[in-house]
Amino acid sequence: MSLLTRPAAPLAAPRTPTAVRGKLVPLALIVLVCMAAYALFIPRIMAALDPLTGDEPFYVMTALSLAHDGDLDETNNYAQGDYRAFYPPDPLPANWQGWPAFPRELPPHAAHSVRPGLYSKHGLGVAILILVPYLLGGRLVTILFLNLVAALVAANIVLLARRYGHGWLGAVALGVPLVFADPLMSYAYLIFPEIFAALAIIYAYRRGREARNTAPQWLGVGLALAILPWLHARFIPAVLGLVAILIAGWLRESSWRRRLAALLPPLCSAVALPTYYLAIYGKPFPSTEDHAGFNTPPEIVNAAFGLFLDEQWGLLIHAPIYLLTAVGFGVLWRTRRGDLLAILAVALPYLALVAFYRVWWGEWGPAARYLAPLAPLAIAPLAAWAGQVRRAVAVVTVGLLALPGLAIMAGFLAAPQLMYNQPDGFNALFTSWAASRGEVWPKFFPSFQPYAPSPILVRQLWSLWLALLAALLCGLGLLLPPRGDRAKESTAARSIGEP
């Protein structure tokens, strides 16, 4: 099956109200349970991560400018100190649990604009998405909204796992180590583009791999494609990959209603976004001056491995469950090659751009920030692998690899400030755990970021180890004896009946 080819549409079972309810009820339950689990920790997050830090306050300032002034010029908003609305009192209360130090005057993240005034360099999409929740109830309602988006990501993860023949319980069990670990759970509380992008990418990918879509489903795909570039320009390569895997199915649609539902949102976005850039930058694309610089070819390779192995920000250090994607890739190559090529079409261009960034780790934020939007797609190879091995093997392997990630996330929830690291090479959580036992963290894992890098030989050896391990696991997936393609259960009846 080629990259642009989707499965042919088999005969669909009747879409009865009972069948639809049978799918919507478990999905609603998944969303509610995830939201409840996330919401349990909101008080701790809000108390410890106060005031807003990283990029978060700048999205709020843009939202306040839109709400109060109806414009994007934030000159008066900073002059008036609008940020004091989400800052703690001065002096701090005696029971203060938030950040021990922060600037009392928020320095703006200004774009290099050709227009007079002060415009944020951050994408406009997040500010627009949080505008209504923030006006309704400030940070609390905004976090609840983020929790809802994260819960919808969880529901899509489960639906994608079911594509590979798993029942509801099996799909949920496979999704838990992704949903309740870094990076997805960390960014479920933070005003960043990541969790919005994660939902848009997995939904568009999932619908793109189904044989048929209804008009509302095509509209959802179109909205996902339209929103992503407004969250951040770095998502444009992922959008192009999604278009590549969606175009064949769109061209096969016989209904112009369904075609228009998918086409109109991204078409409007494709016109509006360059117009916005022209107004801000005087050119139809964002300014490279708004970034902290870019890597040379050797630095790109270093960043590519650092995204996974860096002690402070590496994905595999914080959630080793993602190692199983390598063996899953081997399984997909043998059983669902089109799915694998579709994942690579979305992921590789995006990863190449992120590795090109000098600050590839996302600076002041939890681990694996730039990998969070792609993290939900890991359920596809994970579920494909789990469908090819004995259940006991899947349970034990997933359990063992999930435990470190769940434990690290528990540590972050107990002390949320430890999600953030100074670029000194030492993981704040690991250092804290060692100190609680009266020990010094021995720094077992390498550092790839340029401010405190490990010796180049150490980084090269770890990179070689990861490359060999990934190749070995992928080869193992290729050699696994087939157990029958349980994924064939994914019929048109399922694809139409599920959102």
Residue ranges of model-derived segments:
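Start-transfer (signal-anchor) and selected internal transmembrane alpha helices
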Residues: 1-44, 162, 258-265, 395-400, ...
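Loop-to-helix entry region of an early transmembrane alpha helix in multi-pass inner-membrane enzymes
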Residues: 113-131, 135-155, 172, 186-191, ...
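Perimembrane helix-loop-helix junctions
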Residues: 206-210, 237-267, 324-336, 380, ...
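Interfacial juxtamembrane loops and adjacent helix segments
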Residues: 68-126, 130-134, 290-296, 358
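Specific aromatic-rich, kink-prone transmembrane helix
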Residues: 156-159, 196-213, 220-225, 241-245, ...
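Membrane-lumen/periplasm interface segments of specific transmembrane helices
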Residues: 229, 258-328, 343-357, 375, ...
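Membrane-interface alpha helices of multi-pass inner-membrane proteins
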Residues: 63, 174-179, 207, 217-232, ...
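Transmembrane-helix motifs of polytopic, lipid-linked glycan transferases
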Residues: 141-165, 198-203
